[in-house]
Structure formats: structure tokens, C-alpha cells
């Protein structure tokens, strides 16, 4: 008999929707960031070399990467505005994006030192972007700082361009940073350098945003970000931003890393913030291995959002890791084939079968958890485990459906998946 004193009230087991931090809605082309809108996934193109003697063909090559990211699910794609050649290429890149059926406004320009000059020399090219990003630490220096910032904001106002004010701990406003460090050194209770660093990031972002508003940029045209590389810094900085303002927030580590490290760092930081209602658009800044597709950063963002139930992009396939009760790799092969089948068919299903992204499929390796896990899915298949005879029980909506036998189990299960999608998502 369970001691009632050891149990919690039933309320402890109730789930409730994430309470989103209230932010302004910023419209970038057809994409809405902030407010109660779904979290927006974005990415950044690595970028192709733009040949000054052949701008158009170079731009078409550049556009291929942007389009690949868009097809992967990136709702906005950022490019570096780092040269005259890129500025000249923008109309051609946008043209290719439009040809592919996407809104050209998904293209976002990331400006650093060069932005002030480029908006003067190529105003008609920059204005067709969906949004521009500026870094207060790199806009200008000395007496030119405020002047350049003001001119860029005035340009954005004139051309109705949303602006992300993106502060980065690797290129902080040196004047603000020195001022805060000097004040801290004179304090009777000085803080650590990490505390001052975080404070500088937040003050730079919010101070720049308020300055932009004073110039005339509407708060509904402003997104802010404070990029760092350490997860705990990310959490503390964005928690402070959320407490201090209602600007739409762009989340992400500035350099997450490569491989598992990058994925884990990104997931740890973003999940905590998103679960606490903080964040309106996200990016996974992963270092891709040579030859690896940049689209992986889009997939990671989608997986994070889906795993915590904020957005759904693809059917969820649950599968066991295997253990001593599974004596062959049959269930792993089946899992891979099921994932591949779903991935191949999703472009069609998304258009033809709305709601299919909520479907749950379970592929289990043995009878210990197989039947139970399968009953929690829309469709589940459970292999017998040790011995691995080609016999698999299939469950549909929590109930036993049929048993598949022989060497064509995947083909038969594939037909069951297809039939379920057609009948349940129309």
C-alpha cells in the first residue's frame, strides 16, 4: 500500500502551456516574429564567392544555398553584407528565391563595419531585403558612432525595414564596456568580470534599441539579440532582457561548436529559455564539418521546438536504443527505413494531409516496452526481441491491429503508414 504522505497532489502532474513572454510582433515579409506567433526558425548561409566580373552567375550559386535552407524549413535566411559584390548580387539572389516560390523577403542582411557605406552606395539593393541586422559594437568609432547609427536607422525607417540590433560578446561597444568596468572598480562591492560582461551586453542592446526608437523606428520594427558562447551566460542575459523589455528576442549562441557539442550546447540553452517563455526566433550556430550540409542547423532548431511541444514539423518517430534483448540490427534497420520513408513523403503530405506533422510512430526492438510504447503512438510496431524472428506486432491508435511476418515487414508497414495518413489527415 502506498503511503499517502509520500505522494504529491494531482496538481503536481498537470501540464500547462508555456506562458510566452509578451513581446512586440515584428513582421518580416510574410513572417511574423514575436507576440503570440509561432517561434520562427532561421539560419545563415555560408555564402559563395561573388565574382565581380560575373555578379549574376555568382549570385545564382549563392541563391542555391539560401533556397536549400528555405526548403529545409528555414523561414528566414541571413547573408553577410560584407562587400560591394554582395550588395550588387542581392537583386539576383532575391530573383532566384522568388522563382523557387519563396518570398524574397526571407533574405536578411547581416551588416557589420561595411553597412553604413553599403546603404549609401547601394540603397536600392539593400532596401529589398526582408530585414537588416546591425551590431552596435561595429557601427562606428569615436565621434562617428552616433552619426552612423542614426543614418542606418533613418535608412531603415525610410524603407520600412525591420532591424535586429544584434550585440555580440566578441565585438562589444568598447566605450560602454570600459565605462562599466571603471564604475565597477570604484564600487564598494565590485562584481566579477562575467557579471559586468553580461550587464554590458544587455545595456548595449537595450540602449541601442531605445536610441533607435528615439530616432523614429517603431518598437514593432525592432528585434534584439545578445550573442555569447556559454550556455549559462545565454540564460542569464536573456532572462535579464525579458525582464527589462518587450522587444522581440532572437535566441542563439554565437558559436555553439561542431558535432554533438554544438547540438548539446544549443539545445541546453534554448530549451531552458523557450520553456520559460523567452524567445521569438531561434538559430543554431553550428560549425559544419567539411562537406556537411548547412541545413543541419535548421533540423536542430525544429527538433528542439518539437521536442518541447512548441511547434510541430514532422511526425515523431520513437525508437528504442537496443540492449541484450535484441540480438540483431533488424529493428535499427526498420527504424532507419521508417524515418527515411516519412522524410521522403513529407513534402507531399504537408500540402495534401494537414496535421500529419502531429502523427506519432513507434519502432521498438523487443516485447519488454514494445507493446506499451506502441500503444502510446498513432502507429506502433514491436519486434519480438531475442531471436529476432521476422515477426512484428502492429498497433493502431493504442489497439492491436495485426502481426506482420516474413521478409517484407517494412514494405507492409510502409503501406500501413501511408493508409493511415490518407485516412486520418485530410
Curated annotation (Swiss-Prot):
Belongs to the IspG family. This is 4-hydroxy-3-methylbut-2-en-1-yl diphosphate synthase (flavodoxin). One of its GO terms (molecular function) is 4-hydroxy-3-methylbut-2-en-1-yl diphosphate synthase activity (ferredoxin). Pathway: Isoprenoid biosynthesis; isopentenyl diphosphate biosynthesis via DXP pathway; isopentenyl diphosphate from 1-deoxy-D-xylulose 5-phosphate: step 5/6. Residues 1-20 are annotated as: Disordered. [4Fe-4S] cluster binds at residues 320, 323, 366, 373. Signal peptide: none annotated. It is an enzyme of class 1 (oxidoreductase). Converts 2C-methyl-D-erythritol 2,4-cyclodiphosphate (ME-2,4cPP) into 1-hydroxy-2-methyl-2-(E)-butenyl 4-diphosphate. The gene is ispG.
